[in-house]
Amino acid sequence: MATVKLIDEGAASPRVKAVFDDIKATKKIERVPNFWRALAVHPEHLELVWSRAKAIMKPGALDLVIKEMLALAVSITNSCKYCINSHTAAAQKLGMTTEQHGELLAVVGLYNQMNKLADGFQVEPDLLPNVD
């Protein structure tokens, strides 16, 4: 259960309604997801987070399905049940297959374990990226 009362689309202020309308148009969805309705209790924060999400999650060097799969990987690592479901649905809508989903989960599980082991052993980095 949410810790704030979700803002209903019909009761939204004009400022919030503008963001809600943009979310629905951009995501091509019929209703505003609960996450955005929760953020709407603070309209300025809603605008800032939506603006950032819209800028980052638009087509770019990474395909949209890859971006959603990355968002899903982070959500799994952060144990965000809402986010896991939301990003799984979004990635599936963009074409993520069951096989890709399973492979993503395997990679996330493997590297969560390996990262914890590297941190636990306090291993010094010896393979460094190129910086041009």
Residue ranges and their predicted role:
Residues 1-132:
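Hydrophobic alpha-helical segments
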